[in-house]
Amino acid sequence: MDKILLGCHVSMNKQNNYLVGSVNEAISYKANTFMIFTGPPQSTLRTNTNHLYINQMHELMNSYKIDAKDLVVHAPYIINIANSVDQNKWKFTVDFLIQEIKRCEEIKIPTLVLHPGSYTTGNYKDSLNQIIKALNIVSNYQVNVKIALETMSGKGTEVCSRLEDFKYILDNVKNKDKVGVCLDTCHLHDAGYDLSKWTEFKEQMKQNFSLDKVLCIHLNDSKNMISSHKDRHANIGYGYVGFDTLVNVVFDKDFSNISKILETPYIDKTPPYKIEIEDLLNKTFTNRL
């Protein structure tokens, strides 16, 4: 079997030389892939990519056999391309998304995960159409970067907690090769999908889109019971999704070539990723957190 691509969200900051620090953090967890934000997730503040140590990042990754094609960027949370109510806000977030795409192209990271957004006070179907409209616009700026729309928990007015929403979007975007899906195991569970029946869930996916549309997986346990629509991540093996179910996801041969990214909570301000990665690869829950 191919090597398991397993990593986590890592920080990127000035004191650790930006992207060089991101690679070093991933290496410290024995991760062979990772995900970053290119700036604060709740802000439009961005450091010019010329200052992010891009070349040094790629040199360091090469020495540790980490492939840039496996890396993931998460788009800022403030982007809401589903907004069908306020066109000025919608245009602002589309423009900001274009800037993020350009940054991914410059950093040479090919997958940009994006929360599809919320319909707020608008109409659900109108919001899905706004997403399609936005994706059609930004596709003109995508050269090597693909957007992975993330499965959501259905909290509040979030769209895309149903696989059918992804089918509708993927069927109707113009440049179908530039858009895919990011599966989030916590969100799927909270949205009502029973991932302990993984084979059945994959069949449900196949009824809506082909499995090769899955560009990455966010691997998280959940603090809440199924169908809770809460979106509260738990550490691996400590939640309602369960360790064995998450091991099944990690070792699924259909997804062997895509990155599984942990976004689990810190324990007493300490990242849990090294232990979680080790446990998952060993298929053994050691209860060390």
UniProtKB/Swiss-Prot annotation:
The gene is nfo. Endonuclease IV plays a role in DNA repair. It cleaves phosphodiester bonds at apurinic or apyrimidinic (AP) sites, generating a 3'-hydroxyl group and a 5'-terminal sugar phosphate. It comes from Mycoplasma mycoides subsp. mycoides SC (strain CCUG 32753 / NCTC 10114 / PG1). Zn(2+) 3 binds at H187, D231, H233. GO terms for biological process: base-excision repair. Zn(2+) 2 binds at E150, D184, H218, E263. Belongs to the AP endonuclease 2 family. It is an enzyme of class 3 (hydrolase). This is Probable endonuclease 4.
